[in-house]
């Protein structure tokens, strides 16, 4: 007899072998019908997999996150089933789960059209309605190769070639369609009803632009119809907030083919940039940072010495002059070490906090570029703290407090923290990495925050704390980082004089709050749907006259607002006021000021905030209200 321990601690006995599906059926018909898969001794398994020893078993249903991901993975296989029925010559490649969805890469003779995707979705619904079982068969490797050879699935054969040698592999049969996978998958297509194919894109085989282009069909799947509906509404809202669309509508920036991944900032967009940069500069000055500026281009030998050439050269732009080879900087950190090294440093100088709005360039693949979110030329709100080991925790706490306060000022109150640990490709010994990772854990503990850990996600020179903000649509964006580095000071020979008159290496803390300013502006545009809070808006007020009689008073109002520090524009066009209000509304200015004869006579302004009419206000009182609104946002938040 087998002893099966369930999550509530109860133990049930079964004849050996037993499956998760059989265990669920013995508990109740409702649970049996809802069973997607199981977790046996911590490992996810198919509902049909035999259990042959005493085990701890959890039954996975669509209510579990793992259940949702299994449904999504099975939907990807269903895409394959539908595609092969409609387009028999198509070659299936890979179909993984991604956040909130899945995709399948497919090789076709000609690109799919939106009409093709609609036909594939319709066929998937027809297949789901057949309510067929998904059958798993553990198949000898040689037989699996034969199956795919007979079906002409060349990409599956290439994938098998790359896999470790195994005696048997999981083959999942959707009627006549078969696909290979580690699994688990749903036992029946009834679990796949709440899905939607969302978009079509191109993707290179193995992500290499030198390889052939494939067709990528994206989709999503959920446990319930309501969850699917809510997701679709969220995606539709995200499309309305797309920073590329709003960037054009609000006249903030544009991109063009002649400068891929480089941004052309328009006056309003550059005004927004300057508001952010000046605000960050003020916060950094108050926190004890000294601003510096380092060269854009440095000799290749410098990057070899820092370790960037060995670990990062594929992402670096290079050039040559007078028989010397140079690289455009992808990061600011080595330059800051040079400033630290320029002069004899004492323990009394530590911590030394050097900040730079540093312009960097990285040779990102063209297919990965995406508006402001993924660019080749960008500016980081970068800073490096040179300190002793004893100062790590206090500096981390101060940084954490600064970061959280700034995020709140920008409207982000939900912040999660991750600790990224050593990657496979890295500089420095394991002892150094042990020390660095433990140092960041101690710092996080001192900050009193909860965190998750991400093995293999650290930078090549050190582990890092990642700060993720959640936006108005519930999406998570990684922005801030704090990285602990013992390696770069060693490689670039940074040192200071200790209290005992000895020489020692400083610890280097790499830190950013916004990350790339370009990307952060993209996030802000989408989070606020282009309707920026008053303190942040590139144009805070637009002042409009009803007739020419009020033009001079409008100029006086604008001058008074500008003298009080506000970014105000005039609209004195000879147009009807209704038209001017509608026309200016598309730019989503926080306030619209309308001036008629009555306002001019009484030294007042008629105020509109978005679509709300606030009535006629005394100008001085209105300025005081604006000042209080900004104080509340930046100080009281």
Curated annotation (Swiss-Prot):
Chemical reaction(s) catalysed? tRNA(Thr) + L-threonine + ATP = L-threonyl-tRNA(Thr) + AMP + diphosphate + H(+)
The ranges of region (Catalytic) come to 242-533
Q: Name one GO molecular function term.
A: metal ion binding
Q: What is its EC number?
A: 6.1.1.3
Where does the record say this protein resides?
Answer: Cytoplasm
Quick check: keyword Aminoacyl-tRNA synthetase in the entry?
A: yes
Q: Which GO terms describe its biological process?
A: threonyl-tRNA aminoacylation
Cofactor(s) for this UniProt protein: Zn(2+)
EC class: ligase
Family named by the database record: Belongs to the class-II aminoacyl-tRNA synthetase family.
Q: How does it assemble?
A: Homodimer.
The record describes the protein's role as:
Catalyzes the attachment of threonine to tRNA(Thr) in a two-step reaction: L-threonine is first activated by ATP to form Thr-AMP and then transferred to the acceptor end of tRNA(Thr). Also edits incorrectly charged L-seryl-tRNA(Thr).
- What protein does this entry describe? Threonine--tRNA ligase
